[in-house]
């Protein structure tokens, strides 16, 4: 998708709406209908009024208790224009919100999984794996760990777009620098960390409260690949009275499930999970 002509960066003019009452982000982007939501706030369809191109606009309340949009914007800038990294067109205020304008993408891997009756062939999963291991390698090369592997966070390009076959990685709100920018050293090993990520896919060490590193992203990818191959994972659907107890049960079941059982009939996936 071509880059809109508007400036990419912080909005020093503070525009949030026009005199006509249309909600705007910066001088270019008109805010449209809601197309999604999350812990950060909501996702809106937007339009670049100079180019007539559609965009995605993430809105986060300025009074958010745990603001992460500006950090996510910084991480996108750190990642640059690598394959499968969405373009970020703008960051700035929008009324009572902080707004980030991004390239509009197509459906997620979870959407496609549903469309395929929740069955992906081995060939399809291997094609996905090749792209996503490469994508994660690129993220790691920029001194970031992702920490939020789930099918909903991997999107193909829009239909008819030249990037339609490219799987993009989105949502860096939980990402973290694993190389200290001052010392240039790997962050220290720590324990008793709170859980970060999606319990279904996160690594066993994450359940154990250990500081995440690159291997945890790769293990989480392995769990996601097996989800696609099996249709579900052994630790799905566990009942518990509280979220904490449920996370504990998921972690216990992961540890109790041998890799050979998880990856039955897929020995190469077992080799991958043992390796990471």
UniProtKB/Swiss-Prot annotation:
The keyword Nucleotide-binding applies. GO terms for molecular function: ATP binding; protein serine kinase activity; protein serine/threonine kinase activity. GO terms for cellular component: cytoplasm; nucleus; plasma membrane. Keywords: ATP-binding, Cytoplasm, Kinase, Nucleotide-binding, Serine/threonine-protein kinase, Transferase, Wnt signaling pathway. Its main location: cytoplasm. ATP binds at residues 35-43, 58. Residues 29-276 form the Protein kinase domain. It comes from the Eukaryota. It is an enzyme of class 2 (transferase). It catalyses: L-seryl-[protein] + ATP = O-phospho-L-seryl-[protein] + ADP + H(+); L-threonyl-[protein] + ATP = O-phospho-L-threonyl-[protein] + ADP + H(+). Testis. Residues 12-21 have a biased composition (Polar residues). Its EC number is 2.7.11.1. GO terms for biological process: endocytosis; positive regulation of canonical Wnt signaling pathway; signal transduction; Wnt signaling pathway. Residues 1-21 are annotated as: Disordered. InterPro entries: CK1_Ser-Thr_kinase, Kinase-like_dom_sf, Prot_kinase_dom, Protein_kinase_ATP_BS, Ser/Thr_kinase_AS. It is found in: Cytoplasm. Casein kinases are operationally defined by their preferential utilization of acidic proteins such as caseins as substrates. It can phosphorylate a large number of proteins. Participates in Wnt signaling. Belongs to the protein kinase superfamily. CK1 Ser/Thr protein kinase family. Casein kinase I subfamily. Monomer. Triazolodiamine 1 is a commercial name for 5-amino-3-([4-(aminosulfonyl)phenyl]amino)-N-(2,6-difluorophenyl)-1H-1,2,4-triazole-1-carbothioamide. This is Casein kinase I isoform gamma-3. It comes from Bos taurus.
């Amino acid at each position: 998708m071509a880059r809109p002509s508007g400036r990419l960066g912080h909005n020093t003019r503070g525009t949030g709406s026009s005199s006509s009452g249309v909600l705007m982000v910066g001088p270019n982007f008109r805010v449209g209908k809601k197309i999604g939501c999350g812990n950060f706030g909501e996702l809106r369809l937007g339009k670049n009024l100079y180019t007539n191109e559609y965009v995605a606009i993430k809105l986060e309340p300025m009074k958010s208790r745990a603001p992460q949009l500006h950090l996510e914007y910084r991480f996108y800038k750190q990642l640059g224009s690598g394959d499968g990294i969405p373009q970020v067109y703008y960051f700035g205020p929008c009324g009572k919100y902080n707004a980030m304008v991004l390239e509009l993408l197509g459906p997620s891997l979870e959407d496609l999984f549903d469309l395929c009756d929740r069955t992906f062939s081995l060939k399809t999963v291997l094609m996905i794996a090749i792209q996503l291991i490469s994508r994660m390698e690129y993220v790691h090369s920029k001194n970031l760990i992702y920490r939020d592997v789930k099918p909903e966070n991997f999107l193909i390009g829009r239909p008819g777009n030249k990037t339609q076959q490219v799987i993009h990685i989105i949502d860096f709100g939980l990402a973290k620098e694993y190389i200290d920018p001052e010392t240039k050293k790997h962050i220290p090993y720590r324990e008793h960390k709170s859980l970060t990520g999606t319990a279904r896919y996160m690594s066993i060490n994450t359940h154990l409260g250990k500081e995440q590193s690159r291997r945890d992203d790769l293990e989480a990818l392995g769990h996601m690949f097996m989800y696609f191959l099996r249709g579900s994972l052994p630790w799905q659907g566990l009942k518990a009275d509280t979220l904490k107890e449920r996370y504990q049960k998921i972690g216990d079941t992961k540890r109790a499930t041998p890799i050979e059982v998880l990856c039955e009939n897929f020995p190469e996936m077992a080799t991958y999970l043992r390796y990471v």
